[in-house]
Amino acid sequence: MQTGDTYKIGVDLDGTISEYPDFFRLFTKAMAEAGCKIYIITDRPPGTESDVAAELHHYGITYHVIKITSNKAAFIQQEGISVLFDDMDHYFRHLPQEVAVFKIRQNYNFDFQRSIWRD
């Protein structure tokens, strides 16, 4: 869960930061200033870290680590990340209960007219 006094926070890029850049700009800055370590975890093509860094700079996102992986759950457990923001269930479905997950609602994962999550 928590490592010493430092929370490790994972944040997805596509469908998360990209949809709410103003919130995540403020959030990542505040959390980093509070001593948290911010991981940007994205399932982009391997070798695109510099493109991701440029996009994060454009959004004004504060971060410490960029990780490109399709197996986010394994990376999160390996690094001891205790909080995740993501929009896609399959990335966090197999995380242990100790990892707090904040799911981002989008048209493709939430039916706003019926007020229910989509499968």
Name each model feature, range by range.
Residues 1-70:
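Alpha-helical substrate-recognition element adjacent to the catalytic core
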Residues 54-56, 80, 100:
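Short low-complexity, flexible loop/linker segments enriched in glycine and/or proline
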Residues 48-51, 75, 93-94:
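Phosphate- and divalent-cation-binding pockets in alpha/beta enzyme and binding domains
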Residues 73-90:
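Conserved Lys-Pro-Asp/Glu-containing loop-to-beta segment of HAD-superfamily phosphomonoesterases
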Residues 38, 63, 82, 99-102:
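Hydrophobic anchor at the start of a short beta-strand
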Residues 32-33, 77, 96:
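Alpha-helix boundary recognition
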Residues 69-72, 107:
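Short, solvent-exposed coil/turn elements at secondary-structure transition points
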Residues 85-119:
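Acidic, Mg2+-coordinating phosphoryl-transfer loop and its flanking beta/alpha structural elements
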